[in-house]
């Protein structure tokens, strides 16, 4: 299952393993910076589809990306054949929600942190719209927060840095 519970936290983290393709590498043998954005996009699409498969068709808003921020921490190991992307909902607003992703190499080392703001849209008008109560309920079931912070009334973004790629048997 692509969703995993994280001990001591509410919500769930979505995990997706992606193969590295020849086209992901630049002429220097490094994974090109644009490939990280593709990994992020592929994982977000899978994340939304998985949420919808659990909660039902039409339960997740149609979205456009409003903002993307990538923090490249280190290059992906040249020996890596796959990357793992851990995705979590971090906040929910009136028309948008935040997703935080960690891209890990095959050794489980965090190589990039991605923060995305996605806006719910009316596809007919391509205009932002409010997240419905039922969509909000689905998104809230995915939001991850440390239980201790919730008990203290804090709402900081959780730290999923310690998640490792799932076993290949999952």
Stretches with model-predicted labels:
Residues 1-84, 90-98, 102-170:
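Terminal targeting signals and extreme-terminal segments of soluble enzymes
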